[in-house]
Amino acid sequence: MGLKSFESRRERKYKRGINSFFKKVDRKGISKVILDVRGNRGGYVLLLEHVLSYINDKGETFDLNYLYKRSKLDRFETLSRFKKLDFVKKALRVYPKGMISKEYDFYKSPMGSMSSILYQKKLSNPLDITYTGECTLLTNGLSMSASVLLASWFKDHNRGQVIGTPCFGSMQGTHGNAARIVLENSRIPITISTLKLSSIEQALIEITPTKKIQYSIKDLTMGRDPLIEYLKVLKNE
């Protein structure tokens, strides 16, 4: 399955595509699945979690530390007025219990405040399917952000082989929630991160592929994909 991005303007459509794929895998009894995140520059953690819900064979929570800085660019300030009111209403309903209460405390803190919140997400999907077969992940230097989190999870949970070249990030985590600003003097638009996501107790080391394979000049001129060729050889063996 090619995952070109975790960013989609149509969240429901994206999730339906993932649901459809794993429904077919389950129905046909497929025992080997390949996830290709080469060139996937990331997107929403919510969509990454949806993919993980299908391959989380050990049933563990997806744990991430979110390091926020309160600003006009954080995800709470970019919510619509209706969604912001809905968030406050839900938080006050359970306060001071639950993860949403920690988010509410951060939301009410002064601009410039920093806070670290541990999210422990219980992964689930509407089809209640957990694929437990062989799983392989393809990565390259343009696998970024949420793709880094996927690769880190893959290695940490020994979910399968990681094939290709190291992704753009380490086992320690990545950055997210991109915001666009325009520099005051030059008027040049830039995109910056407003959030750091860190895996629990991971060292700052690269995510080394199980099998390192990179394109050669000959591969490029012939339009050949060396990773796919390698997988074909494995299949024949």
What residue spans do the PLM features occupy?
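C-terminal "post-core" interaction segments
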Residues: M1-E237
